């Protein structure tokens, strides 16, 4: 009867009460138990008071109780039935994984953004390439057109040069005829001047002797002084005029030296095309017109330009390797 009563009394005690009684029998304090089990004092107190902390999982609580029972020498089998009541195993609530779905959604959005970015980049690169190709093709067509125009201009200039030679010769011959006629008329006049009166004998003798000499005087000596006189009088005038014209022309002179074959076109302020064609290597071109000049040069690196004795800067066209289109004036030359 005593054994059964003791057993019933033991079953009536809760898990926490039995653990506290065993601790007190061993003379241990809650602080000592907490230090040995590496627990908080509040956790040991909750176990002895049969409290289940809300923030503590039942699995951990059952483990703490088992460790506490081993420490105070209580068999684990005696505590198992009471542990089911004191710390029942609660079903864990499995929360849906939001992080994976959010990451997948974010990854999908980033994928669309990257695709759009690459698409924009490809479009920009394509447009840039198309613009460069069109510009390059236009330059090639322009250079081809310039070369065709230059060859045609060279052919025309060759034909015009061949036709102009006889015309200049004829004009020179025609201009010389009036001068000869003038000299003849001037030489005849001194011969026809009246002679002083002479006796009949002297007249006859003089006619016999002088007649041959008069023929010679009419043919050669008379022409020579009059011709030289006319040349000395008339030639200085065109020389002075040419000097004045050369001085005026040099003020707007445009000099170009070529280090390689180059096509160019030069137009003055009146719209007159001074030159249009191809210049060969080591060539020099001197042009005079009314400033300012408009120049179109196919190869700027192959030409050196001087205007009014000052060089014209073509470096900006040489760097870009493009056809040079510029206007040369006195202000631009002074600024350079």
Swiss-Prot record:
A biological-process GO annotation: regulation of cell shape
Keyword terms of this UniProt record: Cell inner membrane, Cell membrane, Cell shape, DNA-binding, Membrane, Signal-anchor, Transmembrane, Transmembrane helix
Entry GO terms, CC: plasma membrane
UniProt subcellular location: Cell inner membrane
Gene3D superfamilies per record: lambda repressor-like DNA-binding domains
Membrane topology listed for this record: Single-pass type II membrane protein
Side of membrane Cytoplasmic, spans: 1-111
Transmembrane segments: 112-132
Organism domain of life: Bacteria
DNA-binding region: 30-49
UniProt-listed InterPro entries: Bact_Cytoskel_RodZ, Cro/C1-type_HTH, Lambda_DNA-bd_dom_sf, RodZ, RodZ-like_C
UniProt feature, compositional bias: Polar residues: 165-190, 200-217
All ranges on the Periplasmic side of the membrane: 133-336
PROSITE patterns named among the record's database cross-references: HTH_CROC1
UniProt domain HTH cro/C1-type: residue ranges: 19-71
Chief subcellular location: membrane
Function comment: Cytoskeletal protein that is involved in cell-shape control through regulation of the length of the long axis.
NCBIfam families noted in UniProt: PRK10856.1 (NF008109)
Full protein name: Cytoskeleton protein RodZ
Native source organism of the sequence: Enterobacter sp. (strain 638)
Gene (name only): rodZ
């Amino acid at each position: 009867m005593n054994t059964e009563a003791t057993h019933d009394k033991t079953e009536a005690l809760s898990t926490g009460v039995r653990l506290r009684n065993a601790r007190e029998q061993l003379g241990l304090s809650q602080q000592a138990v907490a230090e040995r089990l590496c627990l908080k004092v509040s956790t040991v107190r909750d176990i002895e008071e049969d409290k289940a902390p809300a923030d503590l999982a039942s699995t951990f609580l059952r483990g703490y109780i088992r460790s506490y029972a081993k420490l105070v020498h209580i068999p684990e089998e005696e505590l198992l039935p009471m542990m089911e009541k004191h710390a029942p195993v609660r079903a864990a609530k499995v929360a849906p994984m939001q992080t994976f779905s959010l990451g997948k959604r974010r990854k999908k959005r980033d994928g669309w953004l990257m695709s759009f970015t690459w698409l924009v980049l490809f479009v920009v690169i394509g447009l840039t390439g198309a613009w460069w190709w069109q510009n390059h093709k236009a330059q090639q067509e322009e250079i081809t057109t310039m070369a065709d125009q230059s060859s045609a201009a060279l052919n025309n200039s060759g034909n015009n040069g061949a036709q102009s030679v006889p015309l200049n010769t004829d004009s020179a011959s025609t201009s010389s005829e009036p001068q000869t006629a003038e000299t003849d008329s001037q030489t005849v006049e001194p011969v026809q001047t009246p002679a002083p009166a002479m006796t009949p004998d002297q007249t006859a003798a003089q006619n016999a002797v002088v007649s041959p000499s008069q023929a010679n005087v009419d043919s050669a000596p008379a022409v020579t002084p009059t011709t030289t006189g006319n040349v000395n009088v008339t030639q200085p005038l065109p020389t002075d005029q040419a000097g004045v014209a050369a001085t005026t022309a040099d003020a707007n002179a445009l000099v170009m030296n070529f280090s390689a074959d180059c096509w160019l076109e030069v137009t003055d302020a009146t719209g007159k095309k001074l030159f249009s064609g191809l210049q060969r290597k080591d060539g020099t071109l001197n042009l005079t017109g009314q400033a300012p000049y408009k120049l179109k040069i196919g190869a700027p690196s192959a030409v050196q330009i001087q205007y009014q004795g000052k060089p014209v800067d073509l470096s900006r066209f040489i760097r870009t390797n493009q056809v040079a289109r510029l206007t040369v004036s006195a202000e631009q030359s002074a600024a350079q």
